[in-house]
Amino acid sequence: MKYIGAHVSAAGGLANAAIRAAEIDATAFALFTKNQRQWRAAPLTTQTIDKFKAACEKYHYTSAQILPHDSYLINLGHPVAEALEKSRDAFIDEMQRCEQLGLSLLNFHPGSHLMQISEEDCLARIAESINIALDKTQGVTAVIENSAGQGSNLGFKFEHLAAIIDGVEDKSRVGVCIDTCHAFAAGYDLRTPAECEKTFADFARIVGFKYLRGMHLNDAKSTFGSRVDRHHSLGEGNIGHDAFRWIMQDDRFDGIPLILETINPDIWAEEIAWLKAQQTEKAVA
């Protein structure tokens, strides 16, 4: 079964994220559990936690259908010790918030070397950061998102994701989220079913589908291999509809949150309905 949704706003209270997801007929959703552009956040209150859990129960969202995202400020591969420590503390807080909310996944951008250390050293720092966070939390899986490779951001090669996973001690609590726009911008072609087969065969060989814990379904304004991260609505960008139809008809993508981060929230309900219809097409065929 496919879990299909979008990254919805939690403005006005975390429970509102579940309500907004239900309003667009989503069977999955993503959210920030705190302001993503600030380091600090007030601790979660018992009331906030209870309201969120009640809303998820009311609208039938389990933790397997929810993919929280951490703060954009966090860099788990930071080359400067003091800044790395700050990022690690913030990441642990994000993991603990998920734990309190009964959420089992936390999606994050791996990190950037800022042209100050090697890729290898940065990847090792990211893995070490994950190990520290896993040691201080329970029940939450660290879900590494592939990047488009802008600037000095790592994670744009499947080999980067594999190297991080290799350095994580508890393999049962690490996974990956593949963003289609990021993959395309990083040089993994998705424009035809044949290219999708090739790209995900590479993914299976280098990383492994057992680590796939979520996806971001985004078309791309950016061009193929450009290393530029610019999302677009499904079918309106340089990837096109075929990739998303292909994903919907492949059962390797079942049972994980498939999250839209496309640029027009006004048509998320339409995009979700279209994705669901592609899945139905296969059942009818």
Curated annotation (Swiss-Prot):
Protein name: Probable endonuclease 4
Superkingdom of the source species: Bacteria
Principal EC category: hydrolase
Molecular functions (GO terms): deoxyribonuclease IV (phage-T4-induced) activity; DNA binding; DNA-(apurinic or apyrimidinic site) endonuclease activity; phosphoric diester hydrolase activity; zinc ion binding
InterPro entries: AP_endonuc_2, AP_endonuc_F2_Zn_BS, Xyl_isomerase-like_sf, Xyl_isomerase-like_TIM-brl
One Gene Ontology term from the biological process aspect of the record: base-excision repair
Disulfide bonds: none
Source organism (scientific name): Escherichia coli O81 (strain ED1a)
